[in-house]
């Protein structure tokens, strides 16, 4: 098969979206109510990693970067994730705190996009979550200098075993280079796939203490 034939096959990959629509009359005033409903349905549908979200940031040269992390908490203050504070994304957020999140629930023909500003969590919040993690995950947080170049996986595995021995007694301490961010809720867009590519899109945009809702063309 030639490269051109393969590209033609990819170009024809598509399907109709038929799982239902989204109507203005059915929307709650608060977008978190709809988000909670959709997230619950994603969990009930047993989607793989229903809390997985893409975090998009930009560096000092306006070069965008994306990666997938797990949502760990959400409320009216924002959406929370945790990371190594020496990571690329943490440095980029420090330089430019404006970020975008995306929840891609393909099986349900849905996606949710959040736009807001990321702020560091308090040490108390981070410590509370850190000590709720499985012990091996706590140790794993100590192992990796995230985004740095390494020559082989064995370096990580050896370091993990070394630290597992070191921390075998008592609590695993919270690394000073590990923390979390809360992304404020300035805009939330809900997308529901529709037949004939007539998808339903609704944008919630915060205006003072209320939410303005607009339908967007697909």
Swiss-Prot record:
InterPro entries, alphabetized: Pyridox_Oxase, Pyridox_Oxase_CS, Pyridox_Oxase_N, Pyridoxamine_oxidase_dimer_C, Split_barrel_FMN-bd
Cofactor(s) this protein cannot do without: FMN
Residue sites binding substrate per the record: 14-17, 72, 129, 133, 137, 197-199
SUPFAM superfamilies linked: FMN-binding split barrel
Keywords carried by this UniProt record: Flavoprotein, FMN, Oxidoreductase, Pyridoxine biosynthesis
Catalytic activity: pyridoxamine 5'-phosphate + O2 + H2O = pyridoxal 5'-phosphate + H2O2 + NH4(+); pyridoxine 5'-phosphate + O2 = pyridoxal 5'-phosphate + H2O2
PROSITE patterns recorded: PYRIDOX_OXIDASE
GO molecular function, one term: pyridoxamine phosphate oxidase activity
Cofactor note: Binds 1 FMN per subunit.
Sites where the protein binds FMN: 67-72, 82-83, 88-89, 111, 146-147, 191, 201
Gene3D superfamilies per the UniProt record, alphabetical: Electron Transport, Fmn-binding Protein, Chain A (2.30.110.10)
A Pfam family: PNP_phzG_C
EC number(s) on file: 1.4.3.5
One GO BP: pyridoxine biosynthetic process
Pathway annotation from the record: Cofactor metabolism; pyridoxal 5'-phosphate salvage; pyridoxal 5'-phosphate from pyridoxamine 5'-phosphate: step 1/1; Cofactor metabolism; pyridoxal 5'-phosphate salvage; pyridoxal 5'-phosphate from pyridoxine 5'-phosphate: step 1/1
Keyword set includes Oxidoreductase: yes
UniProt family annotation: Belongs to the pyridoxamine 5'-phosphate oxidase family.
Quaternary assembly: Homodimer.
Function: Catalyzes the oxidation of either pyridoxine 5'-phosphate (PNP) or pyridoxamine 5'-phosphate (PMP) into pyridoxal 5'-phosphate (PLP).
Name of this protein: Pyridoxine/pyridoxamine 5'-phosphate oxidase
Gene label: pdxH
